[in-house]
Regions:
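Membrane-embedded helix-loop-helix hairpins and adjacent transmembrane boundary segments
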Residues: 2-519
Length: 519
């Protein structure tokens, strides 16, 4: 409480008109960090057991859970990246918010309730329940960590970008600060603590975008912009390449199906009391995301009219941070810029917290012994590894890097969960082969596109950057073909497990308890 009082005293003692944008932004960011710590500390008082740290003892109701899922899901890509891409690339970038939201419809239809009925704590837990294979569990563990850390790195880069924009400090300061705050919060209270934090941060992020959009739209009153026919006819504009439509379809596949494979999203469905609550949570999440994504879309359109495009070498992600000062200026512009900067920091904190919990949960149960102390040590590792990855690397556009994580998730856990839940014929060999093929193709293509971006002719270069159009069908096909070739390996227990996944109520008791791998 003393920190809150100190920040309040600074604000009360300072005339807003005499403050620059940097000072106001720093105050706003400090308030968000203090609020995050205070709410997290409240949650720590309720976190005692391993179940509290991993899944909040499965007691989170749909309303709270939906706000928390939305809070952690609306990452740097949603807050900064979407608006910047729409401002620069035009209407084709709308596939990002559409895909980010529509993925929850597929999650609701195919995965949410059965996944909760499985009784798992993590995706590797689900794999062990469904197939009873330690080998498959180990592959899932490696993929959870790969996706979580691939997703975490752009969050840290985004934090560095924000602090650099508002203070002029080096990027590494913001990267280190967010990594340490997130790790400390997760170590202290686990899932129980970050549920409250993420729910608060959803509503704060919504306000941090909605208020600037309304105020700037009212003040500037942008006029109607006439578009020529050719501007609408350039299908795939912004994606480039000789076959832009293929890249758009690839992005759609990655975002529509990738939600089903994101470990920090899936782990939140283990926190609900039952399968019905998981499905109700998904409906509410879809509504909350739809409401939020209206505002970065409108902001992108307004920025396209009011701001020049970024210069060569400058990321589109910084446009939203500069927008209030360019569009309005003065005290109002500084206040709005501070609000946007604070909302961006909230986005980094919420998403990073969920990713660290997901990675720590997997490491604590699969590598360590699953105790509270093990979770805390795993959280330290889960926070420091992406920090070590982020410091020496150069940030790409945040939405594009996050899109890479979606592509890997869509190529691995999406086919595993969909086929594992709805097809009894998926064998252990088929699941392992599909994960290796999907993960290998997507990770390999993305690595090549980042390391050697100019070494490939079109259309290959574009498809390497957006590999889901090839890697997702390949993963599904591999799982099906290998399973058909090894169908003699199916055991009678699969029927009992599938009944537990699909039949509500007492029939769930037939499911096996997840076995822990040998130490």
């Amino acid at each position: 409480m003393s920190a809150v009082g100190a920040v309040s005293a600074v604000i009360a003692a300072t005339d807003a008109t005499s403050l620059g944008s940097s000072t106001l932004s720093l105050i706003a960011i400090a308030m968000v960090v203090v609020a995050t710590g205070a709410i997290g500390a409240f949650g720590v008082r309720m976190a005692r057991t391993t179940s509290d740290f991993l899944v909040a003892s499965r007691t989170v109701r749909p309303g709270w859970n939906a706000a928390a899922i939305s809070g952690e899901y609306l990452s740097a890509a949603s807050f900064l990246g979407v608006a910047g891409l729409i401002a620069v690339q035009g209407p084709d970038a709308l596939w990002y918010p559409v895909g980010f939201t529509a993925g929850y419809l597929a999650l609701q239809l195919f995965v949410a309730a059965p996944l909760r009925r499985s009784g798992a704590y993590t995706v590797p837990d689900f794999a062990q329940i469904r197939w009873g294979s330690r080998r498959l569990r180990a592959v899932c563990t490696a993929l959870v960590l790969a996706i979580a850390w691939l997703y975490l790195v752009p969050q840290l880069h985004g934090a560095g970008l924000v602090l650099q924009q508002v203070t002029g400090l080096p990027r590494w300061v913001g990267i280190v600060a967010v990594a340490l705050v997130v790790t400390a919060n997760v170590v202290a209270g686990g899932m129980r603590s970050i549920t409250l934090v993420q729910a608060f941060q959803y509503w704060f992020k919504l306000m941090a975008l909605a208020v600037p959009v309304f105020v700037i739209a009212i003040i500037t009153r942008p006029g109607v912009q006439n578009l020529f026919a050719g501007q609408w006819a350039e299908s795939g504009f912004g994606f480039g390449g000789a076959h832009p439509i293929a890249e758009v379809y690839s992005l759609m596949l990655a975002t529509f199906l990738g939600v089903m494979g994101l470990p920090h999203v899936l782990v939140r469905f283990y926190t609900t009391p039952d399968g019905g609550s998981a499905r109700a949570t998904t409906v509410r999440v879809t509504a909350l995301l739809g409401a939020f994504y209206l505002f970065p879309t409108i902001a992108g359109v307004l920025m396209h009219q009011l701001m020049p495009p970024p210069v060569a070498g400058e990321s589109a992600d910084s446009m939203l941070l500069q927008w209030p000062a360019v569009a309005v200026g003065g005290t109002v512009g500084n206040l709005l810029a501070a609000l946007v900067a604070a909302g961006a920091i909230a986005a980094f904190l919420a998403t990073s917290s969920g990713l660290v919990v997901a990675a720590a949960g997997v490491m604590s149960t699969d590598v360590l012994r699953g105790r509270v102390r093990d979770f805390r040590w795993a959280a330290v590792v889960a926070g420091l590894v992406p920090l070590a990855m982020a410091l020496p690397t150069t940030s790409l556009d945040i939405s594009q890097v996050v899109g890479m994580a979606f592509a890997v998730a869509a190529s691995t856990f999406c086919p595993l969960l969909v086929l594992g839940i709805w097809w009894r014929g998926l064998t252990t060999a088929g699941a392992v082969a599909g994960l290796i093929v999907g993960g290998g193709l997507s990770l390999g293509a993305l690595t090549v596109s980042v390391v050697l971006p100019d070494a490939w002719p079109e259309p290959l270069a574009g498809l390497l950057a957006q590999p889901a159009v090839g890697s997702v069908p390949a993963a599904f096909a591999t799982m099906i073909v290998v399973s058909l070739l090894t169908r003699s390996a199916l055991t009678p227990r699969v029927d009992a497990v599938l009944a537990a996944l699909h039949v509500p109520g007492p029939a769930r008791r037939a499911a096996a308890t997840p076995e822990r791998p040998a130490r």
